[in-house]
Amino acid sequence: MNLSRTSRTLLRAALVAGLAVVYVPLAVVLLNSFNSDRTFSWPPAGFTLRWWSAAWGSAGLRDALWTSVQAGLGATVIALVLGTMAAFAVQRYRFFGRETVSLVIVLPIALPGIVTGIALSNTFHTVLGLPLGLLTVIVGHATFCVVTVYNNVLARLRRMGLNLEEASADLGADTFTTFRLVTFPMMRSALLAGGLLAFALSFDEIIVTTFTAGAGVRTLPIWIFENLFRPNQAPVVNVVAAALILLSVIPIYLAQRLSGGDPQTH
Amino acid sequence: MTTITTTAASPGMRRRAASFLHRHAGVRLSLLLSAPLAWLGLAYLGALAALLVTAFWSTDVFTGDVVKVFTWANFTDLVTGEVYRTVALRSLGVAAAVTLIDLVVAFPMAFAMAKLASPRAQRWLVIAVLTPLWASYLVKAYAWRVMLSSDGLLGWGYGLTATVVTLSYLWLPYMILPIYAGLERLPNSLLDAAGDLGARGWRTFRTVVWPLTFPAAVAGSIFTFSLSLGDYITVKIVGGKTQLIGNVVYDNIGAANNLPFAAAVATVPVVIMLVYLAAVRRTGALENL
Amino acid sequence: MRSPRPRFARPSLVVTAALALAAVAGCGGGSSPATGGSGAAPGGGAFTPPKIEALKSLGAGEGQVNLVAWAGYAEDGSNDPKVDWVHPFEKATGCTVNTKTAGTSDEMVNLMKTGEYDAVSASGDASLRLIASGTVAPVNTDLVPNYKDVFEGLKLKPWNSVNGVPYGIPHGRGANLLMWRTDTVKPAPDSWGVVFDPASPYKGKVTAYDSPIYIADAALYLMSAKPELGIKDPYALDDKQLQAAVDLLKQQKQNVGEYWSDYTKAVQSFKSGDTAVGTTWQVIANLVEADKAPVETALPKEGSTGWSDTWMVAAKAKHPNCAYKWLDWIISPKANAQVAEWFGEAPSNAKACAETSDKSFCDTYHATDEEYFSKVHYWTTPIAQCLDGRTDVTCTDYSEWTRAWTEIKG
């Protein structure tokens, strides 16, 4: 590739600068979690670990975290199943309305969250008469999480081709066995990447959740939203955010590691 | 493809099901499509349709109950009210600005990641880009509020500009990742070939790189555009006295308890996004999400 | 939710029920007021509530009580282990408390209509709707021993009673105040005119509450600034009066730097000097002062808008005895002091002032100052029937106020 030295340096500089800009606010958040001033004023007034211990002891926070995890897992599982099915259908078959399927899958995430939120809430409550709760949250999240799995699996299927599956069939494996022993292992990393992104989307989602959660269900973003307004609790929120940032590196790293580990297709 | 069956005496249920499925592609297809389409096609689209229907109803002023009588009143108010036009255009402008900024910022970053970094570094770079997505959206917006306040790190103040900057920041990873994926797929040999033919950096970019990664860029833009168009939280945090169309919808649902009007207002961003999606379908961006 | 006041446009999460339930036309008891003519009479200034009997006598506790409350009203230690008045109640009465936190008044009304809850902490707008729809019953104050210690200024008010019959127990009250930075705003203002001044020297540094209900604040100012408009009640505005208020607010917008709807935003704004003058709550003022920023607050001479919440008992409560016990508990001196301090409002029980951990709490919040509160116009939802009793015009309702607010913000 013949990029001049200046181009290369400039591009690298852009990358570094960009990442720096991305991480400065996160550093501010981290700093504020130690800030003894409750309203995040700058520069930080003093250093304290009070908020970290308060966060540790807060039962409300723990419940919210658990609810978010449950919602995320539920939504991810559903998204994995639906996304994979749709991806297989679109990639492997030709049928009328194929393009529309892609469009419909993208729609929940392409339309503004507030629209999805009020549409789903209206349906649940008015049309179906369902009480709003964790289940409706999971349904709402799954709806827009499908697309991440769908795209990852689709991309992988495109690269994979049918050769190995045909070979497996030639060797006598039936449809289910082929899927279990050949197709699935080849798709693992795509599923993982898609699932991880779906979980992240669900974990941090607030707008659709606001409308589908009802009064009793409190996910982490909802808890954060509520507590950002309480002077005594707001710094604890920073702690939560800081902790999330630090902890999230682990699953992301794992996902990246595992992406390289798929059996090669050629 | 023929299945060479073994010489087992009578194939079991599972085997029979498997062969049936294998031979009847149509059945396989419908089974595969059934659940996703039921969920997204029927349920989700149905929910949207139900919402649209509500837009044609009205609210009883005293009891607050919805009156299920067809009326154009909501849409008439929407179209004739000057403020709604202003807010809609403003939201459109914000979404476009955010998309443009993110595109300009993300492309060089993604290019450096895809082409100039070693495979090992690439993995860490992707992690570095993904990690901020896990920091709560709200907290990031508040961090920006802190930085933008007059005694904060940046001190630029709140308002429309602050909103655009914050939104650009929040959605940047959503633009970087698809472009990075697209650039990764771009074979280096093409770039070498362009160089061999005499094209320098900018020419190569304009004639080779950009056209090929255009779908990926558009894919990223779908996220940034849509997320900015409907957002009502960030603008409340850093927007000063600005309001966007998401706020109008939100205010009408909660405070005013006027779902029909809120639904009518909500059709505006929906229509915009549908038009956008229709336009980008041809570019193949939908496969690049 | 902690932030006590922005019921109307609080960036609250639980909007779902509000929108969905509102869309339920005629579902359950939704539209009952109109039936039988005993509900709210359109066009009349007052209304005749449905005939419901208050509880005659208190029996044994049923073992459980289901509440609908604002966040922070029924703390059980899950947010801060030291902030808990629910567990002591459960120990004392044997009634287990299940609280459903609501985000808006609309949601509270709808939750109560389901019949699943026994008591609700209703704001001035919700309370009337609940009474009119027959969702809540009158309260027999003889069964609430602590009621006698409630400030007289809160008893039998238009939002918690009808025709002399009390429908609830006052929880607390607070006023929206004028706050200013003493280093930038001189001389010290005593009138809302300082935020409505078109030629304000504080351009870009004025703040206002981000909710349609703020229109009442403008109307309140116009009551004395433009008496020819004939505004008697800032929540009862006919088209002309509403337009005048809207014009005033549009003019104010030129000078507004930021509209606020949550605590930390307002506190930070004043602290950093981004805002120099505007509407505030006592608790915000306390926080700003605690962080050493130079501010002062005052209740301007025109008076102010404010709020007062009422605990009400459901007409079809499944656990009425425990509900009454809760009502008595929450206004008992110690619990009332605790919730007032946690929330940031004036307690309703006079004896609570002796129980606050901050000994000057009641003074700061003007709990015993009836003169102070006589100038407060408590939040009420504007409805088409004029709240000031006029029958010759139709007043503007809250959905019109919301449209107007959208227009004002532009």
What are these regions (language model features)?
Chain B
Residues 28-61, 76-184, 212-228, 232, ...:
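Membrane-water interface segments at the C-terminal ends of transmembrane alpha-helices
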Residues 117-120, 150-151, 184-189, 200, ...:
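Juxtamembrane helix-boundary/capping and inter-helix hinge elements in multi-pass membrane proteins
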Residues 63-68, 232-259:
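Glycine-rich helix-loop "coupling/hinge" segments at transmembrane-helix boundaries
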Residues 3-15, 20, 31, 180-191, ...:
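C-terminal transmembrane helix and the adjacent membrane-cytosol boundary/short C-terminal tail
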Residues 73-77, 126, 149, 188, ...:
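Short amphipathic alpha-helical coupling elements at transmembrane boundaries
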Residues 68-71, 182-192, 201-203, 214, ...:
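Transmembrane helix boundary and interhelical loop/hinge segments in multi-pass membrane proteins
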Residues 19, 70-80:
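A short amphipathic helical element positioned immediately N-terminal to and/or at the very start
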Residues 197-198, 211:
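Glycine/proline-centered hinge or cleavage motifs at structural transition points of membrane proteins
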